[in-house]
């Protein structure tokens, strides 16, 4: 699996445009639904770290494709029957984005992309009644998680090789069944881009 990811990340040199590194914050909402279709837990959004490493390819003069690795913390706090609880999870995976990039002049550009992401939990805990519960045994958390959404990005080219950018991304997961958990993260990030 690692070799496939490395091949995808390093291939297509003729189409290569830039490497991007970003850091930011996820504001994540959890949506639980039990077999009756109701949410028995009162949860609030909580922040978590977001890191990204990607490679952007020019598909044409207007459209770009972004393929990358992502590390995300999807966290939440709340209560169930007045018992406080907190979820802390770490996910790693792949992200793919495609969309138009518009040149605004003076080194500025704006891009809007449709985004798909697939990731797996590498660590997860639930804090409830003064103890931590490992979430690896919970299939709602420890399963392949696919998310879909969009992103908006403003780029400023500093010189021919180096640029900086600010990005907003919104994703939703869609799990179906008798009892489900869906993540809805909104991510604000900044980063640096290096042209080859």
Residue spans for each PLM region:
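Repeated loop/turn-to-beta-strand initiation elements of outer-membrane beta-barrel proteins
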Residues: 19, 61-65, 107-110, 156-164
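Short glycine/proline- and aromatic-enriched beta-strand/turn motifs that initiate or cap beta-hairpins
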Residues: 16-61, 65, 187, 193-196
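Residues on the lipid-exposed face of transmembrane beta-strands in outer-membrane beta-barrel proteins
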Residues: 25, 49-57, 69-71, 94-102, ...
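Predominantly the C-terminal beta-signal and adjacent terminal strand-loop region
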Residues: 20, 32, 70, 74, ...
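Short hydrophobic interaction/assembly module
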Residues: 62-78
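Flexible, solvent-exposed loop segments that connect beta-strands
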Residues: 30-43, 73-92, 120-144, 175-181
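Sec-dependent N-terminal signal peptides
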Residues: 3-13
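Helix-adjacent hinge/juxtasegments
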Residues: 85-107
